């Protein structure tokens, strides 16, 4: 499990987890590629109190340090990411490559005080069972540490209902 405290509102931590547009720029070579910055269109469905949406995009590279994903090539197979946003601050993310191999992420952000939160991320997968858990844990540590500056710099600190009042910094 990855646990990270942030000097931000929980809404900003969730916003960051669901923003695939920052992957090529903040996580190049790990979650995205600056040569493929476009985010595919996705439709959001509301079922009860849960928001559902999914995207299909070219896969990111596996690296020697982090052989995390089930793909063997960079672009094919494509990765399907299926998100469920459970309000107020919980996400279930399922990753698949069109076969039986898959990953699941459970992420929740706990408000600690005004503009302070704690994020918890649990990851599971049904492949590479011989690989030490520390590989995924270190990968998530790198990703969360790369996101820290982005999450903590957003103004206003809480995601507003009127997004035109947002100043987004990178």
For each predicted feature, which ranges?
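C-terminal catalytic domain of Rieske-type non-heme iron oxygenases
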Residues: 4-170
């Amino acid at each position: 499990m990855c646990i990270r405290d942030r000097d931000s509102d929980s809404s900003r931590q969730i916003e960051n987890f669901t923003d695939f547009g920052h992957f090529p720029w903040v996580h190049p070579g790990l979650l995205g590629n600056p040569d493929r910055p476009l985010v595919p269109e996705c439709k959001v469905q509301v079922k009860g109190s849960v928001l559902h949406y999914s995207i299909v995009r070219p896969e990111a590279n596996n690296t020697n340090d982090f052989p995390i994903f089930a793909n063997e090539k960079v672009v094919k197979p494509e990765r399907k990411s299926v998100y469920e946003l459970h309000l107020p601050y919980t996400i279930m993310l399922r990753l698949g490559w069109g076969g039986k191999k898959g990953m699941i992420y459970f992420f929740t952000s706990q408000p600690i005080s005004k503009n302070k939160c704690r994020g918890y991320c649990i990851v599971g997968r049904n492949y590479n069972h011989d690989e030490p858990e520390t590989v995924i844990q270190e990968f998530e540590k790198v990703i969360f540490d790369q996101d820290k500056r982005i999450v903590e710099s957003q103004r206003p600190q809480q995601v507003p209902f009127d997004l035109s009042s947002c100043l987004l910094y990178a």
